[in-house]
Swiss-Prot record:
This is Large ribosomal subunit protein uL23. It comes from Oleidesulfovibrio alaskensis (strain ATCC BAA-1058 / DSM 17464 / G20) (Desulfovibrio alaskensis). Part of the 50S ribosomal subunit. Contacts protein L29, and trigger factor when it is bound to the ribosome. The gene is rplW. GO terms for cellular component: ribonucleoprotein complex; ribosome. One of the early assembly proteins it binds 23S rRNA. One of the proteins that surrounds the polypeptide exit tunnel on the outside of the ribosome. Forms the main docking site for trigger factor binding to the ribosome.
Amino acid sequence: MDYTQILIKPLVSEKATFVKESSEQVVFFVNPRANKIEIKKAVESVFNVKVAGVNVVTRKPQARTKHGRVTGQTAGYKKAYVTLAPGEKIDFFEGV
């Protein structure tokens, strides 16, 4: 799998911002088929940083019903909490 297909986008939320400021972690939405080793290599090659560790959270699609008739499901996704080595930094919003 290509590195550009592994990292989908960075997650920008209140919790992700708190995690980034309090510890040396960044959060990404990643391809559901990617494993921790592939995610680590992708972050190191794309952002030129050293990665200390990767934690992964997978959310499966959930069934939903509207008005008792229309059924469907929510989107599933996979998030990666990437811990950077001491002294490393990724700034997504440089110059904004």
